[in-house]
């Protein structure tokens, strides 16, 4: 009898044997329902359906995201994208690029930047299937990030309400 990948993962998690998600450089814990919460940092292949523009002839691009909120029906996760360089296309956009220091996040190789200008809508099931759990934003960073996202005009109030930010 064949069982699905999701069922296999559930069995392993129930037995206390958390499998690892791996890219070429790192191993991550598989994302569990408990990991999908505000402030979680997840490594996932982003696709066009997430609202992310995949460049070149690729189907996906591996990215770090930070969970900002979850829809009321618990199906869609609102996330911000982490970049290696700040997006400073114009001043207002540069002002909402939040620095994430390597000393606070040991799994990064360098200082990174959280782009607080756009919420990406990623299905919860896709995060559970393909994501790697990395950890959480520090409490001090979270307070500043939350206020930045709550007050930015780059994200619509309806999107903020949809994900419980307002």
Where do the model's predicted regions map?
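Compact nucleic-acid interaction/catalytic patches
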Residues: 52-104
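C-terminal terminal-subdomain/extension
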Residues: 1-14, 18-19, 96-166
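Short, structured beta-strand/loop micro-motifs enriched in basic residues and often containing a Trp
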Residues: 17-27
